Amino acid sequence: MSQHLLLLILLSLLLLHKPISATTIIQKFKEAPQFYNSADCPLIDDSESDDDVVAKPIFCSRRAVHVAMTLDAAYIRGSVAAVLSVLQHSSCPENIVFHFVASASADASSLRATISSSFPYLDFTVYVFNVSSVSRLISSSIRSALDCPLNYARSYLADLLPPCVRRVVYLDSDLILVDDIAKLAATDLGRDSVLAAPEYCNANFTSYFTSTFWSNPTLSLTFADRKACYFNTGVMVIDLSRWREGAYTSRIEEWMAMQKRMRIYELGSLPPFLLVFAGLIKPVNHRWNQHGLGGDNFRGLCRDLHPGPVSLLHWSGKGKPWARLDAGRPCPLDALWAPYDLLQTPFALDS
């Protein structure tokens, strides 16, 4: 047996016995083109920063657009596409800073390397989210993907991001923008609103909570003094300063603890947000969250766009565009996501 063949056999045995972690990123992505500010973009300099701990002024700048997203191996392909879409449609892409949140159990260095290789010029930070504190509060929902502790990271942004970050746009990983995110970030929150998002008052709001909730005379009074409407938590503008002052993370956790004692809802991280904020948010034009393109939570069937203009397409629901494209069964609207997909195909890797 030749030495070369022996080495190949040994290598094969090593690969067979090496477990592949669920957090391992095996996909490779192309490098995105670099995008530059237009001439009228505001300058960000050292005077913009009021936090000596932060290395670059942009991470604390009020002139920057701060975007928060979660990162994990399962959705990294969607995250990369979302970032590309944000940058491509921005008038001031160099004034955008990304705040990524990854689970403590994830390979944060691998996630960081993936973003860096596709966007070497991007200003971003990866924050590690210790899920142990929230895991004890999570109750099972109608779809296992909704039970992932990282889905609850949006409730902890005020704790994870530096205190100097006062406002952030939170985005899910299964969406793309086709408009300038600065317009969304500039949403007027008024004198006291903590959160802004498109709300949908035609949706059957009662369906988001169980009969146990509505039949309880105390719990059912939760929305008595507000016009509560459904809103999707995948796209939100959040005033983190007001969030911190109002201790809203604790308020959400209180409802999650209640859910552990009596089942008052079925849909993961969404209902606690509705319980705390529904009827109190600043409404945003529906164009900023054309959601539901992933179908329902059970079958993920194809759906059409809602009537009206579109600034953001969101594949919330079970069906994800990258999975349907790979399976050769894409929905018509998945073709709008495909141009932002930076995944390197096996052919491209070999060439």
Curated annotation (Swiss-Prot):
UniProt xrefs under InterPro entries: Glyco_trans_8 (IPR002495), Glycosyltrans_8_dom-fam (IPR050748), Nucleotide-diphossugar_trans (IPR029044)
Residues bearing carbohydrate: 130, 204
GO terms, molecular function: polygalacturonate 4-alpha-galacturonosyltransferase activity
Disruption phenotype: Dwarf phenotype. Severe reduction in the mechanical strength of stems and collapsed vessels. Reduced fertility.
Top-level taxon of the source organism: Eukaryota
Residue spans, topological domain Cytoplasmic: 1-5
Cellular compartment(s): Endoplasmic reticulum membrane
A family per Pfam: Glyco_transf_8
GO terms, biological process: cell wall thickening; glucuronoxylan biosynthetic process; leaf development; pectin biosynthetic process; xylem and phloem pattern formation
Pathways involved: Glycan metabolism; pectin biosynthesis
Entry keywords, A to Z: Cell wall biogenesis/degradation, Endoplasmic reticulum, Glycoprotein, Glycosyltransferase, Membrane, Signal-anchor, Transferase, Transmembrane, Transmembrane helix
Tissue localization of expression: Expressed in stems, leaves, flowers, siliques and roots. Detected in fibers and xylem cells undergoing secondary wall thickening.
Endoplasmic reticulum is among the record's keywords: yes
Enzyme Commission number(s) from the entry: 2.4.1.-
Lumenal side: 27-351
Membrane topology term: Single-pass type II membrane protein
Chain segments annotated as coiled-coil in the UniProt record: none
Family from the record: Belongs to the glycosyltransferase 8 family.
Summary of the function given for this chain in its UniProt record: Required for the biosynthesis of the tetrasaccharide primer sequence, beta-D-Xyl-(1,3)-alpha-l-Rha-(1,2)-alpha-D-GalA-(1,4)-D-Xyl, located at the reducing end of glucuronoxylan. Might catalyze the transfer of the reducing Xyl residue onto a protein acceptor in the endoplasmic reticulum, which is then transported to the Golgi where the subsequent additions of sugar residues take place.
Name by which UniProt lists this protein: Probable galacturonosyltransferase-like 1
Organism: Arabidopsis thaliana (Mouse-ear cress)
